[in-house]
Amino acid sequence: MNFKYIFAVSFLIASAYARSVQNDEQSLSQRDVLEEESLREIRGIGGVLLSAGKAALKGLAKVLAEKYANGKRTAEEHEVMKRLEAVMRDLDSLDHPEEASERETRGFNQDEIAKEKRILGPVLGLVGNALGGLIKKIG
């Protein structure tokens, strides 16, 4: 007889535990859904703010570029223009990241080629002069 009571109490405890686990899972899934919806809303608002900020920065950069494009520039103004161009490239890279990385790679390669030309140009000139002098002495 004690066995029946122990079994009944164990069954009640197990079913109560199963219901509490099920309720916990449901509340967690509802919480996850709410969090996901909140994140979507935040991302949407963030996207709108980001695009508005990009548009404002592009407009400001264009106005400043037009201002500095007309007339002579001081070295400081030239530096400002370089920074504005860099900002414009960065803003464009947010819109098209693949193209921006390709442009950056091309720009880096062109810079490297220019450095090599600056270094190799005088060296090749000296080598050419030395070979020319040797040929004159031999000939």
Swiss-Prot record:
The Gene Ontology biological process terms listed for this entry are:
defense response to bacterium; defense response to fungus; killing of cells of another organism
Annotated propeptide span(s): 19-43, 74-118
Query: Which segment of the chain is annotated as a signal peptide?
Result: 1-18
Q: Does the keyword Nucleotide-binding apply?
A: no
Q: What is its main location?
A: secreted
Where is it expressed, tissue-wise? Expressed by the skin glands.
Query: What are the subcellular locations of this protein?
Result: Secreted
Q: Which Pfam families match?
A: Bombinin
Q: Which residues carry this modification: Isoleucine amide?
A: I138
For this UniProt record, the keywords arranged alphabetically read as follows: Amidation, Amphibian defense peptide, Antibiotic, Antimicrobial, Cleavage on pair of basic residues, Cytolysis, Fungicide, Hemolysis, Secreted, Signal
Protein name per its UniProtKB record: Maximins 4/H3 type 5
Q: Which organism is it from?
A: Bombina maxima (Giant fire-bellied toad)
Lineage of the organism: Eukaryota, Metazoa, Chordata, Craniata, Vertebrata
